[in-house]
Amino acid sequence: MLRTFTTHSRLINELFANYLNTFFAFCELINNSLQANAKNIWIDIDYTSNDEALQPLVIKKMVIRDDGDGVYVDDINEKLLNIGTNNKEGGKGIGRFAAFQLGQTIEIETVGKSQAKNKSSKTIIPLNYKSFGKNINVSEVQVTTKEEIFDGILKTYYQVTIMDFYDDSITDSSPKKKIVDKLLKENLAAALFERYSLKIYNRDVKFYVNNHLIDPTDYIIGSPSIEDVSYIDKAGKNHVISFRYINLKHVENRKVFLTTTNAGIQTIASGFEFDAEWLSPKIGGWFIYINSDTLGSDLYRNISLDDMDENFKHYKAFLKNQSAHFFREKNKEFDNFLDKLKQDDYYPYKDKQSSSKSKIMLFDKLAFLVEDKYNLLNEKNKLREIIYPLIDRTISNRELDNVLKSVLKLNNKTLTQFNNLLNR
């Protein structure tokens, strides 16, 4: 069937490359699936293999399929071909075209249903970016669809197939179309978990990447901690801020994500890393998701200018203080150890000061890891007389690796962290 696009006075090139990078565009397609009440999302990507050395593209083909509501044939014009309209509450109505930021050729395939008619339909819509040009009147663009109608109610789905990804000749001048690291084979599952961890943990939706289920137990330690805290802004208005703390495997840093609700989906608006010298070396990696029903997303727009934006500066200080309070509670074992360590006769800095505060801090953390492994201080083991000076000398000589590997048997990531601390 021959159908025609409609739009509302927005340039096509603005609509089709409107996201910060290709991962954000990809996530917009995922958000569309979530808005359609999908419980399962399958992502199949044909990556260029190592033996295809002359292949200029990282990705040859991407298919995103969900088991959401789908679009019935009677709604195709309004819901799929009307660009820039608000088809979903709170949404821009352009998210389904985010695929054009990844590739030039798209095929939309959907099965929708009409309960009133007791019928289902299957529609296939082929699209190509070149059909739109840069300034063409969208109402002149026609597309030939394949449509079938069936009696009864079928299982609905929505599928987007993306092909003809952009090569360097295009991405050099349009960097927003370049495939970013989060979309690479080794990174995508973790990036999806970071973006949608609460939904994945709560099993609101299941993600499959090349037939592999993203399992929250592969990423999360224990259960998320949830805390609602009162915040008073610069104008004196009170807000309830929700903190969700998730302890992670295979991650060492702590990321704070500021989220907002967009079209009914909680999405990450911005973020920053949280760190403090007093943190225990066993504190591990955490994602901290922050949300408020009363704080608008406008507050997050100036995060890069937080020293100039007093409202955001005030809010960020509150977030850091609240996060610090949470980790202080987690830090008690380390704090109690330090109290004992600094009173110990074998503590090398009990009666003399080090020339470097960072050296003392590094020693304290290494001594804590030794204690955790060998229980020297708690059992008053006299090996402290040998071990503590050994740690002190290796720090002074900048030869940590041997002790860290042979005594503590730390992994390479932790070794790197301690060496970075040493080099401060």
Name what the model sees in each region.
Residues 1-5, 36-89, 116-288, 292-303:
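Interdomain "switch/hinge" adjacent to the Bergerat
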Residues 3-28:
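Conserved short strand/loop->alpha-helix "switch" segment adjacent to the catalytic nucleotide/phosphoryl-transfer site
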Residues 19-49, 95-100:
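Conserved ATP-binding N-box helix of the HATPase_c
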Residues 29, 75-79, 98-102, 187-191, ...:
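Alpha-helical scaffold elements adjacent to nucleotide-binding pockets in ATP/GTP-utilizing enzyme cores
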Residues 92:
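Flexible nucleotide-binding loop
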Residues 105-111:
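Glycine-rich ATP-binding loops of the HATPase_c
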Residues 244-408, 412-419:
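GHKL/Bergerat-fold ATPase module
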Residues 420-424:
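Long, K/E/R/D-enriched contiguous segments that form extended
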